[in-house]
């Protein structure tokens, strides 16, 4: 008897998920493998991917358009949270996994499957994200993980697929593993596994090099309402169009490349190359607007919780209780994050040159000015300083007595 009768497999068209199809049927006795591929704006022609799954032995090959919920329900919360894992990575890949897992469970329910499957290996982050999300959403569903259990090297995996007529997808000329969606691209493997090897220009597709970026700078304005980006240069755009336009503008000027050593959930360090031009641009502008519209104690507390929010998403805990509680805090802070931020884009950098909020700014010129319009009561400072410094004076006096 097989491990499951009917399985819905999260499918990307890559080598691991393609080999999963014959492996599930031949080695684990699964009768019916249905694949699900998510359209997250990666730009691939999905019909060839759908057909590839059928050619590999899938009984059905489904494709779901998830672009709009991906941006509205996953990318926008990350922008509101200024989510940067380890202070740098804006979670472009990690944000996609809970959405795919959610839809995978829904498809499994629709077709009456008794299990779901994915092609994640045993040393990556995605296995954690999928397994934990599925367990939270559908604890009764089995999760089959052939790529984690089959013990084959990449070369052996490709050879196994060739036995069932699957073409080898990676050549010696292009040894990189690439994951992409509308938010960005992640590139790893091959020569990049040596952290001293500079990434060649051929691995980038969304951004120009600094050398190829225009010599002239460009100023843009990004508008926000309740913490969400809503327009660029005075033009209101829907969420998907906003991301596309931000990707275009930032990419032209060489903004959005990351080369970092990151700490994976499973405890190892990995070298990752990312392109996330639009997402990084929005987070930078959003942070700047918050500095204008949030009270000091709220801003400081939020900056601390942002790191925890990013950690939870990276670690696959999107559907967990702490992430849910932090969402409530993040959303509550965003009611006043309304306004416009102006940035100058030039040769790989985005520099804030202005920010304004008609109804939510906590910057009061009459209080901040040193000119004749100054309304700050300077005389009140003496009493404030006396009380503020009292604990320090008392502690210093005690130190002098003890010595």
Swiss-Prot record:
Q: Which Pfam families match?
A: Arginosuc_syn_C, Arginosuc_synth
Q: What is a single cellular component term in the Gene Ontology annotation?
A: cytoplasm
**PROSITE patterns documented for this protein:** ARGININOSUCCIN_SYN_1 (PS00564), ARGININOSUCCIN_SYN_2 (PS00565)
As recorded in UniProt, its EC number(s) are: 6.3.4.5
Which pathway is this protein assigned to?
Amino-acid biosynthesis; L-arginine biosynthesis; L-arginine from L-ornithine and carbamoyl phosphate: step 2/3
Molecular function (Gene Ontology), one example:
argininosuccinate synthase activity
Entry binding sites for L-aspartate: 121, 125-126
Gene3D superfamilies per the record? Argininosuccinate synthetase, chain A, domain 2, HUPs, Single helix bin
UniProt keyword annotation of Cell inner membrane present: no
Enumerate the catalysed reactions.
L-citrulline + L-aspartate + ATP = 2-(N(omega)-L-arginino)succinate + AMP + diphosphate + H(+)
Binding of L-citrulline occurs at 89, 125, 129, 177, 186, 262, 274
Subcellular location per the Swiss-Prot or TrEMBL entry = Cytoplasm
Q: Which InterPro entries match?
A: Arginosuc_syn_C (IPR048268), Arginosuc_syn_N (IPR048267), Arginosuc_synth (IPR001518), Arginosuc_synth_CS (IPR018223), Arginosuc_synth_type_1_subfam (IPR023434), AS_cat/multimer_dom_body (IPR024074), Rossmann-like_a/b/a_fold (IPR014729)
Its protein name is Argininosuccinate synthase
Q: Which species does the entry assign this protein to? A: Synechococcus sp. (strain CC9605)
């Amino acid at each position: 008897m097989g491990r499951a009768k009917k399985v819905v497999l999260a499918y990307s068209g890559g080598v691991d998920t393609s080999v999963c199809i014959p492996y599930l049927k031949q080695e684990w006795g699964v009768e019916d493998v249905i694949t699900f591929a998510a359209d997250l704006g990666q730009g691939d022609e999905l019909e060839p991917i759908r057909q590839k799954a059928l050619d590999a032995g899938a009984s059905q090959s489904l494709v779901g358009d998830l672009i709009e919920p991906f941006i509205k329900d996953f990318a926008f919360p990350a922008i509101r949270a200024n989510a940067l894992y380890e202070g740098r990575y804006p979670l472009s890949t990690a944000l996609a996994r809970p959405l795919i897992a959610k839809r995978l469970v829904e498809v499994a329910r629709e077709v009456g499957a008794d299990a779901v499957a994915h092609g994640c290996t045993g040393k990556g982050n995605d296995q954690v994200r999928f397994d934990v999300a599925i367990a939270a959403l559908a604890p009764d569903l089995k999760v089959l993980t052939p790529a984690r259990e089959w013990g084959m090297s990449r070369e052996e995996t490709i050879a196994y697929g060739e036995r069932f007529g699957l073409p080898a997808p990676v050549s010696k000329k292009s040894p990189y593993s690439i994951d992409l969606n509308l938010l960005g691209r992640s590139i790893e493997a091959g020569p990049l596994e040596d952290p001293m090897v500079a990434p060649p220009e051929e691995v980038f597709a969304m951004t120009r090099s600094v050398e190829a970026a225009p010599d002239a700078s460009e100023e843009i304005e990004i508008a926000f309402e309740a913490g969400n980006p809503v327009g660029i240069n005075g033009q209101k755009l829907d969420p998907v169009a906003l991301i596309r336009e931000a990707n275009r503008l930032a990419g032209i000027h060489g903004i959005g490349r990351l080369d970092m050593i990151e700490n994976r959930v499973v405890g190892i360090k990995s070298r990752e190359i990312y392109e996330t031009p639009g997402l990084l641009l929005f987070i930078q502008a959003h942070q700047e607007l918050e500095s204008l519209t949030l009270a000091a104690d709220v801003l400081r507390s939020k900056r601390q919780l942002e790191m925890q929010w990013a950690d939870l998403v990276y670690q696959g805990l999107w559907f967990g209780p702490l992430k849910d509680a932090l969402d409530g805090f993040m959303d509550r802070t965003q009611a006043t994050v309304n306004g416009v931020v102006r940035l100058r884009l030039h040769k790989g950098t985005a520099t804030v040159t202005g920010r304004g909020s008609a109804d939510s700014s906590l910057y009061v010129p009459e209080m901040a000015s040193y000119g004749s319009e100054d309304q700050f009561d300077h005389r009140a400072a003496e009493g404030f300083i006396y009380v503020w410094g009292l604990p320090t004076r008392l502690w210093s006096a005690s130190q002098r007595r003890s010595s």
